[in-house]
Amino acid sequence: MSSLLNIENLNVRFNLRYQKFHAVKDVNFKINSNEIVGLVGESGSGKSVTAMSIMRLLPEPKASFDKNSKIIFDGEEILSANKKSLRNKRGSKISMIFQEPMTSLNPFHQVGRQIQEAIFTHQSLTKEVSKQKAIELMELVEIQNAHNKFNSYPHQLSGGQRQRIMIA
């Protein structure tokens, strides 16, 4: 079985004004299709930096990767991928659920519309069909009364509901 995600020799440094900080050192792992994996470690151990590296969300050049670092997702080398290719993958093939969804959800937009926008952006669906799909996804992650919650703002939901919205 070929791996969906292959991390080899991941080394991430933050280039600060007067020094370089080595945030992630020699991380290696593989994840196969349909495999569920948790990234566990102490606070400050590099879990978030590793995840953000996989998504290529770190601010470059302030964050840099060693030359021998490799992140291969679905056969494509992520560290050398162009922005358009990355944009097409994010949200449709790969995504990240942040610990605190309030920092990821726009507080000025209804949660259902935020899901709908992601669907509309990545799939060729009408607004009405993408709205229905958003409601179905909310139901799939067990948001009670999803049709009405579609119009809720993030602050109107519990922390667990906000995390499930991000999963949807």
Language model: regions and residue ranges:
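ABC transporter nucleotide-binding domains
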Residues: 1-168
